[in-house]
Amino acid sequence: MKVLYITMALVLSCVVPTYSMSMQELQNTNHYEMLRGFGESGNGDGTYIDKDSIKASNGPNGTKKTAVTQYVLMPADDTIQEKQVLYTFNTNQSFANLIKKLDTHQLGSYKDLWLSKQKNSGISSSIIDFKVFHVDGNQYDAQNEARDRRMATAPVDFGFAGYLLANRLYERVYGVQFDDVVAK
């Protein structure tokens, strides 16, 4: 019997605490910021970012990278999606740089500028990690999470909610909107 108690004590001491996220936690404005105006994409009813998770770095050829943990409320399912996303910004594709190309006749017209921006917004993203929680904080099981991970995409198409969100993050990190950046 003593062996059983000792074994149980050892097992319980080795239990890894689980992480959860609830709506109540997202209301903590010291740690999370709600980004307004990004629910129109059909991808949820509000996007929050973890202020402490934002990490910025410079990449090759004038690119900048920003990693962030964001939470998207999904009211139809009573869930919160946690996404760790890496955004890559190609400053050569900012509006300011495209206008500069237009001025130096590297682009033929404003239509060419617009088509260039539509084809390549200059922002790409990839989901590094993805979890789903019920709004009460309980995490979904692994099978549902694996299915949801396959469905998770983060397109950054010019003019849509994902593009506006990425621009907002860029401004928060670098102090200027992405499209106002002129590469050297």
Task: Describe the role of every protein-language-model region.
Residues S20-Q84, N90-K184:
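N-terminal secretory-pathway/extracellular module detecting exported/lumenal segments
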Residues M1-S22:
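Classical Sec-dependent N-terminal signal peptides that target proteins to the secretory pathway
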